[in-house]
Amino acid sequence: MSYFNVRVYGVLINHNSQVLISDEKSGGRIFSKFPGGGLELGEGLKDALKREFMEECNAEVEVLSHFYTTDFYEQSSFNDSQILSIYYLVKEVKPLNLIFKSKAFDFDADTDQSFRWVNLSELIPDEVTFQTDKTVIELLLKQIDL
């Protein structure tokens, strides 16, 4: 059965003008995306985003402002749902306590997720896997005029 799948993601840019990217393994696939995930029933968008950052990064974030909502049809890569993704600019409340990798898909043996900072000056849409994330990168680069 087809259904809507509401997702919420955070665009976190640090003081070094780098954006946080999450590399993940799931369902036999590897992919790169912005941190975030699915909205749960009864949850608000900002609360979901804060929960996702806590689950994925063990980090508390402050949601700054809405950045983008999907304005085109996107089929899920994992099932027959239609994806609706909402992106917010966020900032960390405290410095992230993560091990950052320097290359994509550099997973430790016991994990299916790794994080890396990408310089905005080097950021390209192909840095991420899914079309909605690529669109966000294009918009982000236009906004910061790189």
Regions found by a protein language model. Name each.
Residues M1-V19, L64, S85, L89:
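Conserved N-terminal beta-strand and adjoining loop/helix that marks the start
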Residues S2-F4, F31, F78-L84, F107-D112:
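A generic structural micro-feature
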Residues N14-S17, K25, K91-L96, L120-E122:
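Short loop segments at secondary-structure junctions
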Residues S17-E55, A59:
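Conserved Nudix-box catalytic region and its N-terminal flanking loop in Nudix hydrolases
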Residues R29-S32, L98, K103-L146:
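Nudix hydrolase/Nudix homology domain
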Residues K50, F67-F72, I83:
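Internal catalytic or translocation cores that form aromatic/hydrophobic pockets or channels
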Residues A59-T69:
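A short coil-to-beta-strand element that immediately follows conserved catalytic motifs
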Residues E74-K101:
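Active-site-adjacent beta-strand/loop module that shapes the phosphate/pyrophosphate-binding cleft
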